[in-house]
C-alpha cells in the first residue's frame, strides 16, 4: 500500500505560474534514509529575465543532492523552475536562491546547484554554489574544487 504523500502537483491539472514562487516546491519522505545516493536533476529549459534589460536568459540547471529525510518531488521542482520565467534576476542570484529554497525544503546532507547559461555578449556565465551539513563539509570542499 502506498503511503499518503499529500502532494498537490503530481497527478493534478497543472497551472503554470511564471512569477518566482518557492511555495511550488514539495517534498516526500526519503524511502531509504540509511543510504547516501547522489541524485542529479537537470532542467534543460531554464529561463529567467535579465533584471537590467528584461531580455530573456536561457540556461541548463543541474541540481545534485544527497537526501536526508526528504526528497524533492520532480514535478513541483519543474513548476518551481518554470516560475522564474518572468523573474528578473542575475544568473548568480537565481542559482543562490534555488539552493537556499531547496535547503530550506529538504534539509539535505549535501546539495549543489550549477547553472550553464547561454552566452550573451560573448560571455557565458556558469555559477556554482553548494551546501553541506557538518559531516559532509569535506565532500563539499572537494566538489567545489572540482566544479565544472
Curated annotation (Swiss-Prot):
Coiled coil ranges: none
Pfam families for the chain: QueF
UniProt keyword Cell membrane, yes or no: no
GO molecular function: preQ1 synthase activity
GO biological process entries: queuosine biosynthetic process; tRNA modification
Main location: cytoplasm
Catalytic activity: 7-aminomethyl-7-carbaguanine + 2 NADP(+) = 7-cyano-7-deazaguanine + 2 NADPH + 3 H(+)
The protein, known as: NADPH-dependent 7-cyano-7-deazaguanine reductase
EC number in record: 1.7.1.13
Residues that hold substrate according to the record: 72-74, 91-92
Amino acid at each position: 500500500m502506498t503511503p499518503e504523500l499529500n502532494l498537490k502537483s503530481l497527478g493534478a491539472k497543472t497551472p503554470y505560474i511564471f512569477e518566482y514562487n518557492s511555495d511550488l516546491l514539495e517534498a516526500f519522505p526519503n524511502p531509504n534514509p540509511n543510504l547516501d545516493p547522489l541524485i542529479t536533476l537537470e532542467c534543460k529549459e531554464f529561463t529567467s529575465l535579465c533584471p537590467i534589460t528584461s531580455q530573456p536568459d536561457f540556461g541548463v540547471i543541474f541540481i545534485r543532492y544527497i537526501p536526508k529525510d526528504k526528497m524533492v518531488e520532480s514535478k513541483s521542482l519543474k513548476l518551481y523552475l518554470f516560475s522564474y520565467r518572468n523573474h528578473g534576476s542575475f544568473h548568480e542570484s537565481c542559482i543562490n536562491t534555488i539552493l537556499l529554497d531547496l535547503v530550506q525544503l529538504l534539509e539535505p546532507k549535501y546539495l549543489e546547484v550549477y547553472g550553464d547559461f547561454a552566452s550573451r555578449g560573448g560571455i557565458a556565465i556558469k555559477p556554482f554554489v553548494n551546501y553541506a551539513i557538518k559531516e559532509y563539509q569535506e565532500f563539499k570542499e572537494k566538489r567545489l574544487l572540482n566544479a565544472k
